[in-house]
Amino acid sequence: MPETNSSHAHRLFAIENAQEIYSGKLGAESLGVTTQDDYTIVFRLAAPCPDFLERLTECEFMPCNEDFFNAMGGRYGLGNKYMLCNGPFYVSAWDPKTSLTIKANKFYSGASKAKPSSVIFSFDPSAESISKKLTAGSLGAAFLSPDAPQPENTVTVSESVNSSFGFVFNCANALMSNKELRLALCSSIDRSLFGSKGSNIAPQSGLVPRSCSAGGVNYRESVGSQTPAIQYDAAAAATHWKNALSQLGEDKLTFTVLCPSWVEEQVRRQLQIWQQIMGIGLGVTVVTATADEINAAIAAGNYQVALTGIDSPYESAVDFLASFSDGGIFAFSGNEYSDIIKRLMGVDTDGELLSGCLTAENYLLGNAVCYPLYERSSRFVTSKDVDGVYMNGSESTVCFIYAKRYD
């Protein structure tokens, strides 16, 4: 429903009328889902969806007890008192701001009994704070973003190249909403300034991270040399700049670039190139900030240009690209991109899925909403005194039923 504002709603859009219901054009009774009998549910799709059976395994499709749902008076799932759990664990406490606690279910009759008596999930958006807690031993395991330092006394269980890092433009900003200005900036970025910065980072021009797949194959490897990129072209940049000034009715433009300190030197060199091409009519201020500060500014829409990571919690390239349908990190919106994603959701073959993803990626990069520079890895780490915790694929799947912590 529209009022849920769910970031995962697009996973259901393959169902007949789901997207129209979410946009408020139709009522919930129009959804293409019916029951044939007590044990059979029927889904009518708006168009063929190659990975629909896989989607049915995800939390968005989890069934619930109807009597219990109705008894909750509209608060189902909003707290531990409004949940019905029948797995190896049950939710015993939940503070949406700080943590969620689950305990072993002594009535569970499945074959696999839970080894830990309880597990606490701590909510912390700060990469620096998470690293400190792991070092101090107050966390047993965590996902570390590419910005987080490797904590002491931890073991890296797995890595995932799930982040693209580069220039991001706030398309909701009065200046950066101008496509000609964004094209002027992107077509005059000297990629050679931004060499490799360490073991956790490598040059990359595509937006979709290497962790994403499409049509059963790795998307980044499959598109290969077709990876889109805006090429350096000083003459074209100068033309775009003149067009931007004309469209904005200005003879001078000033804006601010937020960046982490480790890339400040390169950004300042890039600033010199921009000023050489665009002249004295361009004024740019470079402000350094921590990754947490930059993320907070982006979340609040309080920025113009930022160098930051664009992380994917998804294994699917389709889901990653669809997450920008409502503007996403770029605050870029338009019916044309929404239509591209809608068509992508309804393709028949794996080949069409790949080409559709490439079309969507090309559209975003061609509109200069961002300029990727690097690919980066997130890590799943555990404390050295923790065993039996591992992840499957993306950050959405972690197994801890056999977890142990040694004193």
Q: What do these predicted regions represent?
A:
Residues M1-A14, L175-S177:
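Aromatic- and charge-enriched surface segment that lines or borders ligand/interaction sites
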Residues Q19, A28-S30, D38, L45-S118, ...:
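Gly/Pro-rich hinge or "lid" segments in bacterial periplasmic/extracellular proteins
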Residues G24-G27, P228-I230, L282-I294, D319-D385, ...:
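Extracytoplasmic/peripheral linker and loop segments enriched in polar/acidic and small residues
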Residues D38-V42, S117-S118, S163-A214, L253-W262, ...:
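Alpha-helical secondary-structure segments
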Residues F107-Q150:
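Ligand-site clamp/hinge motif
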Residues S199-A244, V263-Q266:
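Structural transition elements
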Residues K242-G309:
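Ligand/substrate-recognition segments at binding pockets and active sites
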Residues T382-D407:
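Long beta-strand-rich cores associated with HINT superfamily self-processing modules
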